[in-house]
Amino acid sequence: MRDFMDYIQLAFYDASKWNRDNSYSQLTTTANALLDFSTPERLKVNLSSLSTPHFATTYTLGTVGLIDGSISYLFTTIPLHDTPSRSTLIPLRKLVPGYRQIYPPSLPPAFPAADGRDGDLAIGGTEGDLKKKATLLHATLHLPPPTTLTGSFLRRLSPTTQLSLAFCSSRAPASKSAPQATLVTQILYDTGKYNSEFLFSTDNALFGFKGLWNFGPDPRKQNQNGGDPAREPCRSLLSLLSAGGEVYYSPVSSVVGLSTGLRFTTLPAATENPHSTFPYTLTLTLTPLTGSMSTTYSLLASPNLAFSSRFGFNVYSWESEMVAGCELWRRSKKLHTLQRNSSPLFAVDDLTWARRKMGLQDAAVSVHPERDGLPGIQRDDHDMHHHPQRPHASDSVIKVRVDQSWNIRALWEGRVKELVVSAGIALGPKSRSSLSYASSLAASGPGAAGGLSSYGWKSVGVSVLYSS
């Protein structure tokens, strides 16, 4: 489950009209959400609030033998009026990453002014409004010692350029020396057709570059056909192929890093046709220096069911990795009835998906699925901005993943009254150091099954979120 501050930061990206999917860093987002999710390892309580449209706070308290916590503050120059902040109104799919639908590349529109007006109005506004560019400040203090302070600064320099600063400072207990700090600077440039990121870190003077190229029509040239490239993307495209890579170099430690990857995904236009396939995403990533290769396949089998798998292989060590996972969303009967009795935008029942595939007409299906967002697909859809007070249709989700070593993780996330609860368990082989002397004697006794005693619980935890 995302932290409340991460949820607010994603809302800032949406309000500033920045496409976070068009980045090499997000190449395997769907597979990571379905396969690499984490489970709580202790009891954790989060109290959050969006007290004003510009200011948010979060207080976290956790216990695992020792009590620790954190305090977070966030400020944005863009008012987040349409962002639900109450834990009973936040769409659960906004807090739980899952299958994310990629949309056709489009030219970034003019960003809104700090007073929340549209980009066109901001361009025609005063010079003072133009100088108030979208900015976000975020800081978190982790207590008790070792005290760690983390923070970030985001600023939209232009419709195609964004500046990102992140720092981390920590001080060991009883240390009289100055706290150690690391600063990471990123400049992101997005044209819709391609995206580039330039990075510098003060840790070993690390330099980096990331790039992503989308094959197909250039959204910057769509205006030659009389359309608006910012508001009329290539909706006729059925699929999208993207290629990218990243390279790092540190002159201090002489460290070099290199990776490249491909992503093929279906677009919303491919699911509008009754004879089309289900939404799916394929990725291939290579790390030549270490000899690692990884492929993923993710499929949205229904609006509430998604599968994903990953196979990794190293050509030097001949080691392999196989991981499979799935997520299943559940809708309560009360919310399901409310959904069917509401407007056609929300009237999507369990058979809509099948009717669309069979070519049958269904009045409940929206005529603009690429605008409203398909149900079950991660998208900043219409109902979040225009119906923020409606309960979300999906109120709980179950995630399960397993690898070739039988490491199993299971996660349940849903609402209990006014709380968002996340409960998870992790099972798998235990290391020899974690086995007690008594269990070792039991395993060596008569009738002991070889290796079975080393398999068991790894962690169990619950995380609770309340926001206002």
From Swiss-Prot:
It comes from the Eukaryota. Its main location: mitochondrion. Pfam families: MDM10. It is found in: Mitochondrion outer membrane. GO terms for biological process: establishment of mitochondrion localization; mitochondrial genome maintenance; mitochondrial outer membrane translocase complex assembly; mitochondrion-endoplasmic reticulum membrane tethering; phospholipid transport; protein insertion into mitochondrial outer membrane. GO terms for cellular component: ERMES complex; SAM complex. It is a multi-pass membrane protein. Residues 370-394 are annotated as: Disordered. Belongs to the MDM10 family. Component of the ERMES/MDM complex, which serves as a molecular tether to connect the endoplasmic reticulum and mitochondria. Components of this complex are involved in the control of mitochondrial shape and protein biogenesis and may function in phospholipid exchange. MDM10 is involved in the late assembly steps of the general translocase of the mitochondrial outer membrane (TOM complex). Functions in the TOM40-specific route of the assembly of outer membrane beta-barrel proteins, including the association of TOM40 with the receptor TOM22 and small TOM proteins. Component of the ER-mitochondria encounter structure (ERMES) or MDM complex, composed of MMM1, MDM10, MDM12 and MDM34. Associates with the mitochondrial outer membrane sorting assembly machinery SAM(core) complex. Lacks alpha-helical transmembrane segments, suggesting that it resides in the membrane via beta-sheet conformations similar to those predicted for other outer membrane proteins and porin. This is Mitochondrial distribution and morphology protein 10. It comes from Ajellomyces dermatitidis (strain ER-3 / ATCC MYA-2586). The gene is MDM10.
